[in-house]
A protein has these predicted regions:
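Catalytic phosphate/nucleotide-handling subdomain of diverse soluble enzymes
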Residues: 114-121, 126-185
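Gly/Ser/Thr-rich active-site cleft segment
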Residues: 2-132
Length: 185
């Protein structure tokens, strides 16, 4: 995928897993309705909305920082790959809708409240933010969401996250692109 997209696609990304499943002709693909992250799935179970935060989405499929949505050129390329593998869905049909910080990501439904609290004390209606992973949380916690800011994480792995002022000029396989909760790379 990195070669087809001219953009580094780490093997851990959702789209890389889907691509490998297609290359391996895995049987479950015939009934595949959609793909999501754990955070996105839990959010859908609580709100009924299949949405995901832009930072979380950037670990599923490349994001265009100008639009804050999946990169249209790469979506078109992956649609061609899906067709080559006789998949019935398009990229956009498979992926959750992207939301930026502050976007309407739904409310806690009665069913969602019951999942969290079967006793009925928790009531539906709470506003829900777009689900994000730990990268976005770290960026916000360290106020590293503006251009030319960054942070270093030293936990299970050690890495730096830097908010760029412009797109990279070429593919660097050692750099994994992520997106801030506001949609910047």
């Amino acid at each position: 995928l990195t070669e087809r997209f001219s953009f580094n696609i780490p093997q851990r990304w959702s789209i890389a897993h889907l691509y490998q499943a297609m290359l391996s002709n895995e049987a479950h693909l015939a009934s595949l309705a959609s793909i999501n992250t754990l955070a996105g799935y839990v959010h859908e179970m609580l709100t009924g909305k299949r949405v995901i935060g832009v930072g979380e989405a950037s670990g599923m499929f490349p994001i265009d920082s100008e639009t804050g949505d999946y990169d249209a050129r790469m979506v078109k390329t992956f649609d061609q790959i899906l067709a080559e593998h006789h998949m019935s869905k398009t990229t956009k049909q498979l992926l959750p809708t992207v939301c930026k910080a502050g976007d309407d990501a739904g409310v806690l439904t009665a069913e969602g409240a019951n999942r969290l609290d079967p006793t009925g004390v928790l009531q539906p209606g709470a506003l829900m933010c777009p689900p994000e992973g730990d990268a976005g949380t770290g960026m916000v916690a360290t106020n590293s969401i503006k251009v030319c800011t960054g942070n270093v994480s030293a936990g299970t792995s050690i890495f730096a996250m830097i908010v760029l002022s412009k797109a990279l000029s070429r593919v660097y396989p050692e750099i994994d692109m992520v997106t801030t909760p506001e949609g910047l790379s």
